[in-house]
Amino acid sequence: MSAKLKKLSDLSKRGPHRVLEGDLGYTGLPGKVYTPAEGKNLPGVAFGHDWLKDVAAYEDTLRHLASWGIAVAAPDTETGFKPDHAGLAADLETAMQILGGVRLGNGNISVSPGKLGIVGHGMGGGAAVLAAVDNPKAKAVAAVYPANVAPSAVEAARNLFVPGMVVGPGEDGDSLFDPGNPAKLAYNWAGEVVYRAPKKGDQQSFSEDNMVKRILGLGKSDRGLQETVRGLLVGYLLHQLDEDKAYASYSEPDAEGSGVESLTGEKLTKAAGLARDNASFSLF
C-alpha cells in the first residue's frame, strides 16, 4: 500500500511563523532573503528562478517556506534572455553558503550549516542539480519542473547522490511545450529520489507573474498548483533537512496525496521516454 502524504492540505497553507524579508545584496549577491522572525539552527535553502523570471515572481512561495521555518536565499541573477546556467548554479552555491555562515535578523536567527538544500524552478531546477553535484553542503535538492540547462542537468544527475524530489508532469500532463524532461532527470538520479506529479500541472503555471505571462502568451499562473507544490516542498524539506519524522512520507517514492500522483518503476521509465518496446521479434 502506498504511503499517504499526510497533512498536505495544511502544509499548502501559510505556516505559523511571522516572516522577515531582507536584502541579499548586502553580501554582494543581488537577491532576497526570507526567514522566520526568529529561530536557531533552522533549515535553509537557496532558490533558483526560471528563465526570464526574477525573485518577485516567487515571493509568495518564498514567504510560504519561511512561514514554515525554512530560511530562503534567492539570487536575483541571470535574469536575461541568454543566462549563464553554470553562473546561476554558482550563485545558488554562494547563497547556500551565505545562509549557513551569516547570522540573520538582529542576531536571533541562525541557519544550521548541516541543514542546507537547494530548490529551483524551471531553469533554476536544472541549475539546482548542477550546484548540488559533488557539493557536501547540499543535503537535499528539490527541482520543480526542471528545464534543460547547459551543462546538462539530466546527465549531471547520474553523479548526484544527494536525496532529491522532482516535481513534473504526470500521466495526464501535456509536456509538449515544457523545456525539459523532469522524468528523465529523476530516472537518472543516482541517489534516492521521489517524483511527484500534481494533477494537470505544468512548468508554466508555477511562477506567480501572471500579468507577464498573459502579455507574452506563456499561459497563466495556477494558484491551486502553486499551493500544492508549496506543500510538497515544505513536507520534503522539513523531513530531509530538519529530520522531522512527522513528514517522513514525503520522502517515500510511492507516496500519494489529494491531487498528487507519484511515478516509480515502469511509469517513471515511460514518462522519461525510455520505455522498452516489448513487441515480439520478427524478420518480416
Functional labels for PLM-detected ranges:
Residues 120-125, 144:
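Conserved alpha/beta-hydrolase "nucleophile elbow" surrounding the catalytic nucleophile
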